[in-house]
């Protein structure tokens, strides 16, 4: 187990015969059974591996629009011991029900809330799960249809870093959330019921870091191979941080580079030219730019390792052309067949 579960509970929000949303509240937490542990471990791993998450914080009503403080207030009371876990999650369920009632598209679902510890941080995981129909074969070889929670396709989930929230009230990234496939609008109600306001632009921070790295190596006296080693070092460090759900720390990254003989990156990156936070989450999609060049347009898709630029792949910006030396065997075979045809 990579997590230590403190408490977990499930409440149901569903439509009644008149189409009105109703809450069915569980009166006690889930037992820490093997099934519960397996479910939460799977959700933790699935959520941690989700790319492109957004980050935010509890908004202040008035300063951050109409942010509802009720969820944060209830969470504060739970953390201080003034409100029980069951009572707090019941309040949260009612808040979600009220928010869902504003929209026509929602059918409700199962609200899962769990407090657990991973590494050195305490978390509150919040997810609205849906049921999925499946078929099974009974002992007498007859088919039977049943419903199960769809854990592999979570689209409405958030995780609050309770440790960061209570240690740094000015942080704007202690809440992470999944961006829905159809865009922010579908998930708005889920953020609104928690009073969450989007804070740090993670993609922008990661892209700025990539630009800083490129400018750093371009202005250095490093050889071509050493420059690529620097990019690889940054990629490896950031990827490792992403894998464990930890933030990129600018000073820590600079120390990693200094150990490899590439000094002064911290002073370079924090000089004011680049608006980089001292710490921010990693974005895997942005990090790939350190290892690969890729692009799509006009019916053409290209992708190649950065180390090939200037060797197997020659770019001429004046003629706007790419020359590829040593065409991949499977592509060459397709091209030869087409020419012969």
Swiss-Prot record:
Keyword Acetylation belongs to the record: no
Keywords from the named record: Cytoplasm
Subcellular localization, as worded in the UniProt entry: Cytoplasm, Nucleoid
Primary localization class, coarse: cytoplasm
Keyword hit for Cytoplasm: yes
Coiled-coil ranges from the UniProt annotation: none
GO (cellular component) term, any one: bacterial nucleoid
Annotated GO MF terms: double-stranded DNA binding; single-stranded RNA binding
Family according to the record: Belongs to the YejK family.
Protein name (record): Nucleoid-associated protein Sden_2335
Native source organism of the sequence: Shewanella denitrificans (strain OS217 / ATCC BAA-1090 / DSM 15013)
């Amino acid at each position: 187990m990579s997590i230590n579960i403190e408490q977990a509970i499930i409440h149901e929000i569903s439509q009644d015969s008149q189409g009105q949303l109703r809450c069915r509240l569980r009166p006690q937490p889930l037992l820490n059974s093997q099934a519960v542990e397996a479910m939460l471990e799977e959700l933790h791993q699935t959520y941690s591996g989700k790319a492109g998450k957004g980050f935010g914080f509890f908004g202040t009503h008035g300063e951050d629009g109409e942010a509802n403080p009720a969820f944060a207030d209830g969470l504060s009371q739970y953390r201080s011991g003034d409100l029980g876990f069951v009572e707090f999650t019941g309040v949260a369920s009612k808040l979600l029900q009220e928010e869902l009632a504003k929209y026509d598209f929602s059918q409700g679902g199962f609200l899962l809330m769990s407090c657990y510890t991973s590494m050195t941080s305490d978390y509150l995981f919040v997810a609205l799960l849906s049921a999925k129909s499946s078929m099974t074969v009974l002992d007498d070889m007859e088919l039977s249809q049943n419903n199960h929670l769809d854990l592999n396709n979570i689209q409405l989930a958030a995780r609050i870093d309770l440790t960061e929230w209570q240690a740094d009230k000015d942080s704007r990234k202690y809440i992470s959330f999944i961006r829905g496939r159809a865009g922010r609008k579908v998930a708005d109600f889920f953020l609104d019921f928690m009073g969450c306001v989007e804070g740090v632009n993670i993609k922008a921070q990661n892209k700025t870091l990539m630009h800083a790295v490129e400018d750093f190596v371009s202005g250095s006296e490093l050889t071509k191979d050493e420059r690529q080693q620097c990019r690889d070092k940054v990629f490896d460090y950031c990827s490792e941080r992403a894998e464990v759900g930890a933030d990129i720390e600018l000073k820590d990254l600079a120390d990693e580079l200094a150990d490899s003989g590439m000094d002064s990156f911290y002073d370079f990156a924090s000089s004011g030219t680049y608006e980089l936070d001292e710490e921010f989450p990693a974005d895997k999609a942005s990090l790939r730019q350190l290892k690969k060049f890729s692009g799509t347009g006009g019916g053409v898709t290209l992708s190649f390792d950065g180390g090939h630029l200037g060797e197997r792949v020659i770019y001429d910006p004046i003629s706007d052309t790419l020359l590829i030396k040593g065409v991949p065997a499977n592509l060459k075979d397709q091209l030869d067949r087409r020419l012969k045809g």
